[in-house]
Amino acid sequence: MELQVVGANNALTVSETTFGREFNEALIHQVVVAYAAGARQGSRAQKTRAEVSGSGKKPWRQKGTGRARSGDIKSPIWRSGGITFAAKPQDHSQKVNKKMYRGAIKSILSELVRQDRLVVVEKFEIDAPKTKVLAQKLKDMALNDALIITASLDENLFLAARNLYKVDVRDVQGIDPVSLIAFDKVVVTVDAVKQIEEMLA
């Protein structure tokens, strides 16, 4: 299959298996959920009655005071006591096979092509790390919500895009399923397309 290169008369021949796959919603959902789960910090921690600092002495005798019986000031029903089912740090990451991950990326790229959201350009670069310059370049291309993918990370582009809303710059190694579906348009250079095909082969 062929992808039209914007601003050029030629088309880029690409692999049908990478850019022409069927849309697999279940697979994409599973991979995106796993990706989001892996980003969770999972470091929250509370103390049980065994871990709260304090005396283990019985506050008052069992009988004869008229008060409710109590054996421990660290009881969960007491103020500043322990937590009954205390949360502990945990790893939320889910295992995703390489074949599944690559399949999800291919499925997303193919759907982007079908929806005319994948914009292929010969090159995408600016002379200086100026946000104003990049903003104008995107405006000229009628883009205001875009992920820009280059073969290698362009420092000028990266620095210029940091202060632009809904604009991000990645190299091929930095793409992920969430970023691919988060933007309205995905701008990718010809060299980056070739690298993506090699990576997903």
Curated annotation (Swiss-Prot):
Q: Which GO terms describe its cellular component?
A: ribonucleoprotein complex; ribosome
Superkingdom classification of source: Bacteria
Annotated stretches, region: Disordered: 44-71
Q: Which InterPro entries match?
A: Ribosomal_uL4, Ribosomal_uL4-like, Ribosomal_uL4_dom_sf
Record flagged with keyword RNA-binding: yes
Keywords from the UniProt entry: Ribonucleoprotein, Ribosomal protein, RNA-binding, rRNA-binding
Query: Quick check: keyword Ribonucleoprotein in the entry?
Result: yes
The processes (GO biological process) annotated in the record are: translation
Which GO molecular function terms does the record list? rRNA binding; structural constituent of ribosome
Q: Which SUPFAM superfamilies match?
A: Ribosomal protein L4
| Subunit structure, interactors included | Part of the 50S ribosomal subunit.
Q: What family does the Swiss-Prot or TrEMBL record give for this protein?
A: Belongs to the universal ribosomal protein uL4 family.
HAMAP family linked: Ribosomal_uL4_B
Role according to the record: One of the primary rRNA binding proteins, this protein initially binds near the 5'-end of the 23S rRNA. It is important during the early stages of 50S assembly. It makes multiple contacts with different domains of the 23S rRNA in the assembled 50S subunit and ribosome. Forms part of the polypeptide exit tunnel.
- Name of the protein in question: Large ribosomal subunit protein uL4
This protein's species is Actinobacillus succinogenes (strain ATCC 55618 / DSM 22257 / CCUG 43843 / 130Z)
The upper taxonomy is: Bacteria, Pseudomonadati, Pseudomonadota, Gammaproteobacteria, Pasteurellales
